[in-house]
Amino acid sequence: MAESKCPAHQHVLKANVGGAGTSNQDWWPDRLKLNILRQNNPVSNPLGEEFDYAAAFNSLDYFALKKDIQDLMTDSQDWWPADFGHYGGLFIRMAWHSAGTYRVADGRGGGGGGQQRFAPLNSWPDNVGLDKARRLLWPIKQKYGNKISWADLLLLTGNVALESMGFKTFGFSGGRADTWEVDESANWGGETTWLGNDVRYSGGKADHKDIHNRDLDKPLAAAHMGLIYVNPEGPDGNPDPIAAAKDIRTTFGRMAMNDEETVALIAGGHTFGKTHGAGPADKLGPEPEAADMAQQGLGWTNSFKSGKGPDTTTSGLEVTWTKTPTKWSNQFLEYLFRYDWELTKSPAGAHQWVAKNAEAFIPDAFDPSKKRKPMMLTTDLSLRYDPIYEKISRRFLEHPDQFADAFARAWFKLLHRDLGPRALYIGPEVPAEVLPWQDPVPAVDHPLISNEDASALKQRILASGVKPSSLISTAWASASTFRGSDKRGGANGARIRLSPQREWAVNNQPWLRETLSVLEAIQKQFNTSQSGGKKVSIADLIVLAGVAAVEKAARDAGYAVTVPFTPGRTDASQEQTDVQSFSDMEPIADGFRNYGSSTSRVRAEEWLIDKAQLLTLSAPELAVLIGGLRVLNTNYDGSAHGVFTQRPGKLTNDFFVNLLDMNTAWKSIGGVDLYEGTDRKTGAKKWTATRNDLVFGSNAELRAIAEVYGSSDGQEKFVKDFVAAWDKVMNLDRFDLKKKQSTSSHRL
C-alpha cells in the first residue's frame, strides 16, 4: 500500500494517538448510540454556563449592526468578488441554506444553533461557496463579539440582504444561541456518497430510480445526500419539471411549507443573484472538512482560470434569473410565463433551460458589455408546469402585492420555524402579528392560583376516583410532546385535549378521556367559586394532577416529597392549533409509555433514545424516568410489560432491582420486541418486558446507571432524581419562567 504524504487524507491510516484506533462503533456498528444524549456539555462552551445570550443580544446596538451588514453588501473583496457588485444573492443563499435544513417531522435542523459552521453542513455539495460568505462576515462578527451569535448573524444577514435590494421584510427576531459542536442527533440519510439517494427512497427497497413514484423516508427533507431540498437539474438529474414538482412538494412540505409558501420562496429567492457554473466541477478541490490545513477551514479551491468572480463554479448551473438581480421585482414570474423554454447545458455541463427566441438582455455579473439570454432551472419551470403551482404563480404574477406579502411571510417563517414560541423572540424588529405556525397560547389575564389553592386542588383530584396512574399518564402525555429541537410541544396550551393530539393512537385511550373529563369538572367548579377572577387552566390542572399522583406514589413508598409546581400555563383553543402541523408531531413510538415497535430499520430502543434526546434528557434522566414510569403503571395500553414490581403505584426502585436480578432468565416471545422473564430454577413466569425495558440491562452504559438505582442504597436517590427529572419534563416549555437560556441541558 502506498503511503500518503498527509495522513489526514488517508483514512486507512490510523494515528497512533489517544482517541484514534478502531472504535467500538467500528467493531459493533449496530450498538446503541447514546452519544446524542451527551451533546452540548457545558465544558464545550467557551462562554461558560453563566453567559446569558439573550441579555447580551439585548445590549447590542442592533441598528448599527444592520448598518454594518448593509455596508458589506457592496464592499466587494478581491479575494471573493461580489456578483453584480452586491453580495445580496450570496447572503440570501447562506441564510436560506442555514434555516432550510429544518424538518417538521422531528424539528431537527434549521438555523437555530449555527450548525452551518460545522460538518457535515459546512461541506455539503449544496453549500459550495458559503464558506466564503461566512468569512466575509467575520469582521462584523469579530466587531460585535458575543452580542451576536453566528446563528443569528447568518439569518439576520439574509434579512438585511433582502432589505438592501428594496424588499420589505416581515421582521426579525434574535435569540439563537450558538452551539459549539456538531449536532449528531440529526439524521441526514444513510447514503455514503455525496448526492446519493439510494437509501432514502421507499425504505431503500423499491426502485429508487422511479422518479415519478417513490416515497422519501421520514424525517428526511432532501432528495439527495448533501442537498438542502431537491436537485435543481431535476430528480436524479433528469430535466423533468413535472417530476421535479413532486420532489419540491415533498421536501418543502417536510420543511413545514405549503404550496403557496413554496412558490413564494422559490420565485422570491430567485428574483436575486445567480447560480455559478463557469467551469468543470472537477476543477474544484476538496470540501472544507477535507481541505488542506493551509486553507484554514475554506474549501473547494477552484483551479479553473482565476477560480473566482466570472470563473466561479458552485452548483455547476449558470443562471441569472432577472434583468435586475440586485433589486426586488416581479421579473422572475414575468419571464417564466413570457417565454417558451428549451433545454440546454451550462458551461459546467449541467441541465438548465434557455428562453426560445429571446434577446440577450440579462446582465453579466462582472462584465457590463456582456448580455445573456434569460435562463431557468428545471425546478423553476415546475412553478409553471405543475397545475397547482401554476395557479399560484399566475396569481402572484397578476398581483405583485400578494406575491411580496407571501414571500415576506414565508421568508420569516423559514428563518424562525425552529426558534420556538414567541416568548423566546427578542429584538426591536419582532413583528406584532401572531402567526398560526408559532403555536400561540393565550396570555395569562387572570390571577393565578396560590400554594393553598394548589394543595386543595391536589386533594380534590386525588379524591376524584381517577387512578393515580391515569393522572400521571395524562400529565406525561401532555408535557412529553415537547421537542428541544424546535421547542414545540409541551404542556402549556393543554393541546392534549384538542385535535389532533387527542386522536393519536398513543393518546386515544380510556384513561385520557376519563382524566380530562374529571379535571374539566374540577376546573369548572373551582373557577366558578372564585372571586376576583382567579382561575386555574386545564393545562395547569393536568400538570398539578400529575404532581399530586407522583407525591402520593412517593408517600406510599415511604418518602415525603414535594414535587415543584408553578402555575401560569394557559389553554389554547382549537382555532389556535394548526392540525396539520401538529399531526407531523405524532410519535411513531414512545418507549416511555411502551408504545410502538421495532421496524426493519429501527429498533424500539433506538426510538426511545431519539425521544429522550428530543426531551433534552441525559442518560441518567432517561433511566430514572423509565424506572419510575414503569412502577407507576403508566404503559399507554395498561399492559404489565416492564412493570417489575409487586407493588405497582408506589415510587420504588423495584424496576431496577428486579431487572438486575440474576435469578431471572429472559427469552424472546412474540417477535422481536416482547420478552418473558422466568425463574431460573422453577421456570415460573415472573415478568414480561419490551426492548425498551431490557435495554437497561443489556446495554453496558445504561446498565451501569441501572446499577446505581438498583443498589441497596439507591431508593432514596431514585426518588429524588425521578422527581427532578419529572419536574424538568413538566416545565420544558415554560419559557415564561425566564429560565436562563442555555444550549446545555440539566444533568443529574
UniProtKB/Swiss-Prot annotation:
Effect of a null allele: Reduces the fungal tolerance to hydrogen peroxide but not to heat stress.
Covalent link location (Tryptophyl-tyrosyl-methioninium (Tyr-Met) (with W-96)): Y229-M255
Sections of the chain in a coiled coil: none
Keywords carried by this UniProt record: Cytoplasm, Heme, Hydrogen peroxide, Iron, Metal-binding, Oxidoreductase, Peroxidase
GO biological process terms held by the UniProt record: cellular response to hydrogen peroxide; hydrogen peroxide catabolic process
The reaction(s) this protein catalyses: H2O2 + AH2 = A + 2 H2O; 2 H2O2 = O2 + 2 H2O
E.C. no: 1.11.1.21
Pfam families assigned: peroxidase
MF GO annotations: catalase activity; heme binding; metal ion binding
Family membership: Belongs to the peroxidase family. Peroxidase/catalase subfamily.
Subunit-structure text: Homodimer or homotetramer.
HAMAP family, alphabetized: Catal_peroxid
Name of the protein this chain belongs to: Catalase-peroxidase
